[in-house]
Structures are given as structure tokens and as C-alpha cells.
From Swiss-Prot:
InterPro entries: ATPase_OSCP/d_CS (IPR020781), ATPase_OSCP/dsu (IPR000711)
Organism: Chloroflexus aurantiacus (strain ATCC 29366 / DSM 635 / J-10-fl)
Keywords of this entry: ATP synthesis, Cell membrane, CF(1), Hydrogen ion transport, Ion transport, Membrane, Transport
Intracellular or extracellular location(s): Cell membrane
Family of this protein: Belongs to the ATPase delta chain family.
GO molecular function: proton-transporting ATP synthase activity, rotational mechanism
The protein, known as: ATP synthase subunit delta
PROSITE patterns on file: ATPASE_DELTA
GO CC annotations, alphabetized: plasma membrane; proton-transporting ATP synthase complex
Amino acid sequence: MATTIDARALAAPLVEALLTTAAEQIRAAAPRIAGLSASEAAAVLPADLLPQVRNFLLTMAKEGLTGELNAVAAALPGYLETGSRAVDASVTSAIELSAEQKERITRELQQRYGDVHVTYHVDPTLIGGLIIRVGDQVLDNSLRARLSAIQRVLQAS
């Protein structure tokens, strides 16, 4: 009998614990580093901070944003509660896609990336094909991109 493990469900308690710990550490450090430069903040931060929290706090100090730390700490637990950990995806096509095509693309993106919010756009200059953006990844399978690639190869020869 095959079992399916829901990795996201298994990881949820870990993610919740990490976010809670990060929020607590940010809240505790906020008054200590308020108004300090990054080098001054580094000197007063506790050694037992999560490395990511330490780096985040130093970046906030460097950018002069320590006044926003309490708001950031308050927002962290909300990522789990509101489900806002979903990935945003954008699909651009040369023509309007049918409901069936959109459903298939959404399903495939969800299989690959988990919780995905997909928005669809039409850009006739693509000529054909799709451009799919998920987070910072871009898959440009448009006819416009293919023709541009052929043009670059021909110009290089």
C-alpha cells in the first residue's frame, strides 16, 4: 500500500515554531537597537539569535528601519493564519486562454509549487506561447522569445 506524505502538513509545526521564535527575537531586540547603526546594533545583539534574524535586524538597522520591527514581528505569525505563504504566479499568453487551459495550468503550477495564486494576462505581442512567472523564476516559451533567439543566432554568425 502506497502512502502519500503531505510534506507541507508535516513542515507546518516547524515553520510555525520558527516564525514564532523569529517574531519573539525581533520583538525583544527592537528596543535594544532602535536608532542604532548596523555596527552599533551588532555589538548589542545577543549571540543566541537565529542567524537569519540577526542578519535581518542588522539590515533593518543599516537601512534605518528599526522603528518598523514591532510591526514586522506582529506580521510574522499571520503568514500561517492567513495562508499568505502562497506563491504568486503570472501567466501571460498571446490570446485569451480557455477555462480548461487555465485550470490545467493552475493545477500543474500547484503540483510543482504548492499553494499558488495565478493571474492571467493577454499580450498579443507574444505572437504565441506563454510566459510564466512564479516568484523570481521566468519561463518564457513565447514565439516572440523564440524568434528573438533565432535572430540573435543569425546576427552572431
